Amino acid sequence: ILNNTNLLTDEANSASANDMMIVVDSEKENIMEEVMPAIDEFLDDLSAKGTSEEAQAATSWSEAFDLLPEANVALFSIPGEYGAPEMERALKNDLHVFSFTDNVSIEDEVRLKKLAHEKGLLMMGPDCGTGIISSIPIAFTNVVSPGNIGVVGASGTGIQEVTTIIDRLGGGVVHAIGTGGRDLSDKVGAITVKDAIVALENHEPTDVITVISKPPAKEVRDEVVELLQSISKPVVAIFLGEKPTSHEGKVYLAHTLEETAKIAVDLANDVAVKKNYFEALAKPAVPTLPEDKVVKGLYSGGTLASEAGMLISEALDLGGLVKAEGYVLKSHGYEVIDLGDDMYTQGRPHPMIDPDVRIEKIREYAQDEKTGIILFDVVLGYGAHEDMVGALLPAIEEARATAKEAGRDLYFVANVCGTTKDPQNYQSSVDRLKEGGVLVAESNAKAVQLALLLKGIEISEDDKEVVAYNGPTVDVPKPGEKVMELLTTKPRIINVGLQSFTESIVDYGGETVQFNWRPRANGNKKMIKILDALEDYSEQIEAENHKVTDKIKNAQPFLVDVVPAKSVIPELNDDAQKTLLHAGPPIQWSEMTGPMKGACIGAALFERWADNEEDALKIFEAGEVRFIP
């Protein structure tokens, strides 16, 4: 991040995994006179806050289990390079894993999910940003009414769009189990999706099961459908990218996320599923855009971007989706960008949190005379920006003014993904956007429909009938006891990483303890692997250590002799070389902590190598002192 933003100073480059870095880039020569007091105040506030909070925060797994002995979930938001071993440790301690942590290799994901399955646990993730367990929102999640619909989703914003529409339709969700976007890939084989479906089939309060997937591997998709056709509960499923022409057997197949939610609510209310849920929209009372004007989509949600790109491509026969440089659609001037793609998040926060990259693109598109409509999403909920609407409106107003000066019409069309119970409030967000001249639709699919209508293009959906399913079925396995215990109680969560994730858990009645995790061995991955391997022999090591300590306890020490240090330590006899002996492993001055450096400066003054602390510091920084363990 620092390198990409030209802030990687020599000092920052030498920092280790447990260091805090504060880097300032300013044209003011005396900026440090302003910055240092602010840093001191921040650290003082942090320290004061810590005295009240750290009493209930753990710094190790053993402390976390002491604080919450009945824990059954570990929620991870730590750097991916350290993630897999920590998740494995959690699974081996019989904890379900919810991993917001990403950048975990596909090989590690497969290994961890197989381990979880063998132990009767759920491995939700990696790269799982959204979940609802027993109506408690976890991570980047909306506040949804409790109900009788269970959701399994390999898509974060897909879960958010479906569950929030369910809420606004008067329905409710008891569980939304995120799996991570790669779960239905051929390598992973839908391990978590299958386990979650089986669990919801056996969960009595769940009456309807909803499955949401990014484009799956065909063989894996077929296996999931076979399982869905084998269970007793009604199912609605959406495999993004597919345009089903009928429902199959027990499984209702949706084309859009909105249709998915509407079918789920009808099933939950014992209402007959309609042949068609498409609703025509009235065209706004504004001039129709000419044919050469195009739609530009700027999305913070990857699944919402894919759905928008899919619908535009289908309507205009643009050849389908792409995946290049953040684009999900780029054809004939039409563009839809997933601003949450790695290309846009490297070195900066996710666009659900930070509006800057979208503001930049709004300004860029406003200058393009071909742009007629800018289509975008606003995702509300825990973890999202506290006021994304307020952050975007000035840029929208500026862009419309730019177009007006050039004699062009420029329309903004938005979908707000949220509920009235979200911290940002759905209705307030919608009202403020409308006041700012934005056309707001009730769903992402309707937002695309409205955008095309502004160009005079009307779209529709064909009726879908239920046809017989003639494929194979499977014997539905029994769910693990630990999974069922998770679904029938409030979760008890060890939060490993971002403390802000505890907020929604506490607000909605879950138990949690904060684990202020840091990488072991100062982030040295080789040493971490060694320590992890040693843990498998912890009982034997403890037994051998007891033998040694017993010998020490039973021994009787006695004085042998007292001699000058120089007589037994030859390194101290070189008067030309300043030497300090220290406890612990070898260490250099640059690697020492503040207290250790202070002790060294004190030793230098005692030995009269310097007259004051400033001169002593120069001696050490010049490398004049040798350190011997």
Predicted segments with their positions:
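Long, compositionally biased, glycine/small-hydrophobic-enriched stretches that function as flexible linkers
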Residues: I1-E53, Y82, V430-R432, D463-V476, ...
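Catalytic-core regions of core metabolic enzymes
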Residues: I1-D475
